[in-house]
Design a protein with these regions (language model features):
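Active-site-proximal loop/turn and secondary-structure-junction residues that shape catalytic pockets
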Residues: 51-53, 80-84, 104-106, 141-145, ...
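Short cysteine clusters
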Residues: 12-19
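Auxiliary Fe-S-binding modules of radical SAM enzymes
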Residues: 152, 159-260
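Conserved Radical SAM active-site core
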Residues: 3, 8-9, 21-135, 148-152, ...
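Short, surface-exposed loop/turn motifs that are enriched in glycine and acidic residues
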Residues: 112-115, 140-148, 179-187
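Short, surface-exposed connector motifs at secondary-structure boundaries
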Residues: 69-74, 134-137, 201-206, 226-228
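Conserved, mostly hydrophobic/aromatic
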Residues: 16, 47, 100, 197, ...
Length: 260
């Protein structure tokens, strides 16, 4: 019941190594949201889009539409990227939560995003958002071409001020991108990171997000996630549900974005 909207249609200036604008094609242009709402039982929106060369998602260009959505009672989650402080302050008046990718390895930032940004830039924006609305940090495991670089450092940083929610996603080698021929991170390494987060952030709700490889990898990852103490899995495989039942867990099904 959460509809993903792109504020830039299928356009992205960064053309990142792991995405190349591919996933924007799965989103609805924000100008067309009304017809989709009429045909589906939509209760919330994910506001997203492609990035500028500076790494921000320019959803503020549609602030009147965003304000209108909020006034209609929809819950709003957003991707802001490395947005400037003034725009963050203005937008957060209408946002229930922000999903924010944290990247701490400078080499990864240069290789994946082609930006001259640093860990400090991400921390600064993260803290600014935190001052004005709830933020759910996102960690992409294996972002640097399937390599684990910087993920543990992010978990260590989050221990200082644990978030209510933390979402993990996993690199998908995607056709038409620079990383189409790489291997996703090894499952053992992914599981170790999930366990590290669970142990060190005991009161944080940990989610396994929608962006993760499909097939056998996904089935095995989903089962491992249950065993690592993950709280929510987006579109879980049957094997994950069976594992949860086997472990006598209570299963609650939600219909919206995992951070809402």
């Amino acid at each position: 019941q959460t509809l993903a909207l792109s504020t830039t249609s299928n356009q992205c200036s960064l053309k990142c190594a792991h995405c190349n604008g591919h996933y924007l094609n799965n989103m609805v242009p924000i100008e067309e949201y009304e017809e989709k709402v009429q045909s589906r039982n939509i209760t919330s929106f994910l506001l997203s889009g492609g990035c500028s060369y500076e790494g921000d998602v320019p959803i503020n260009t549609h602030i009147n539409t965003i304000k209108n959505l909020k006034e209609q009672g929809y819950r709003l989650n957003a991707h802001l990227g490395l947005m400037d402080k003034d725009s963050i302050v203005e937008l957060c008046k209408y946002l229930d939560i922000v999903s924010f990718d944290l990247v701490f390895d400078d080499e990864t930032i240069r290789e994946v995003y082609k930006m001259k940004k640093s860990k400090e830039d991400y921390i600064e924006v993260y803290n600014t958002i935190q001052e004005h609305t709830e933020v759910a940090p996102h960690i992409c495991i294996g972002l640097k071409g399937g390599q684990i670089k910087g993920e543990y450092e992010i978990i260590e940083y989050l221990q200082k001020n644990p978030p209510n929610k933390l979402t993990f996603i996993v690199l998908i080698p995607t056709k038409g991108t620079e990383y189409e021929n790489v291997e996703p991170p090894e499952l053992e390494g992914v599981a170790d990171i999930l366990c590290e987060a669970r142990i060190n952030l005991p009161d944080t709700e940990i989610n396994l997000g929608c962006m993760r490889p499909r097939g056998v990898y996904r089935k095995e990852l989903d089962q491992l996630s249950i065993m690592c103490g993950v709280n929510r899995i987006v579109l879980p495989s049957r094997s994950a549900k069976n594992k949860a039942i086997e472990m006598n867990m209570t299963i609650n099904e939600c219909k919206e974005c995992c951070v809402l």
